[in-house]
């Protein structure tokens, strides 16, 4: 399973290509990964602009101009890649987001997930913290808000292995 630093690296990688790009369409070759893919996802983001790319925990969030956010989770074996529009599709390329860069160049964001434990969904950006997968997440492991005092408070009454507490 991609760990948090790998998800952050993926987020930074796609951000270089996707920021301010226009989504042309979204294609899915399967109807479900971990869960059923919403059937309207194919149409809902056509001709929207990508305003921001974020990450909460292991979820990559693609905020768009239609006030909705695409939510991606890489699952156990998933990864993202950016290719030219005329790329050769591989067997496990399950989600393809066709987009136009600000330079006018057409590219694709490919979500490849061999084991199909990944996830794609969308939710209102203003209400994102209430999404069923995001609402119970704790403080982000890479957050600058984690201070010594906070960790001291958490660990002061624990008598278990430190790795278990951190995870």
Provide a role label for each language-model segment:
Residues 1-68, 88-89, 96-101:
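Extended, highly charged segments
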Residues 70-167:
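Phosphate/anion-contacting hairpin/loop surfaces
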